[in-house]
Amino acid sequence: MAQLHRWDFWCFSTKPLGYLDVVQAIEAEVYDAWRQLRQSANPSKAWHQWKSETRKLFQDLDKKLRGQQEAVVHVAHATFTVAEMQYRQCGGEASHIVF
């Protein structure tokens, strides 16, 4: 049985656009890239270089944000587990009101 080859493409996540600093950095970067393209002797090469560098930057940013989100979820899960254990160890209905 032949296995189909699967191509995985990275898609730009719109989550970083929720941060004003990121949007302003993108705007400044685009303006600089536009200026460089206008002055370049070989705009196609400059464009592909800028595109690959920008893609790498966005991939790294996306990876960092996902890592931070996973860390927050892990801490919240641990906190919830501790609260759940304390709830089960408490005796009586009056003690359960605290939780």
Swiss-Prot record:
- Organism annotation: Plasmopara viticola
State what protein this is by name. Secreted RxLR effector protein 94
Its biological purpose is as follows: Secreted effector that completely suppresses the host cell death induced by cell death-inducing proteins.
Q: What is this protein's gene name? A: RXLR94
Q: Which domain of life is it from?
A: Eukaryota
Q: Which spans are transmembrane here?
A: none
UniProt keyword Secreted present: yes
**Gene Ontology CC terms, in alphabetical order:** extracellular region; host cell cytoplasm; host cell nucleus
> For the motif RxLR-dEER, what are the positions?
35-55
Keywords, ordered alphabetically: Host cytoplasm, Host nucleus, Secreted, Signal, Virulence
Record-stated family: Belongs to the RxLR effector family.
